[in-house]
Amino acid sequence: MSYAEGPDGGTTVPRMQIRKNPSVYTGAGKVGDFEWMIKQPKYARSLFIFNDNETQFKAFHANQPTGLHAGGGNAVVRPFQGGSHPRAAGIPTGDGAGYQHLSAHVKGVIDEALGYIKNLL
């Protein structure tokens, strides 16, 4: 078992084993269908990372109800961001047509999302 420095900088804590399982949507009711997967006991301890709209990402982090509305595609799991044990987290890909350039603003929003995910883990 390996150890990492704890949050206080002095103690050590066991490293958590994290598995990343990429998925591709190939149809309903099977791996890749986040709406189906998140309801399966096999994935009860999984954090689903989905493509989010920047507007709804910001709404969620501002505790606005629209930040928990289900979206299309893999954003169907957006409501699972809520509660005391979040099961989903979004990474903004823009609004509408998506981000066209990796500007300082875009990098900042993506970094915010990755920081939030890191804290969940």
Give the location of each predicted region.
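Macrodomain-like recognition of ADP-ribose-binding/processing modules
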Residues: 1-121
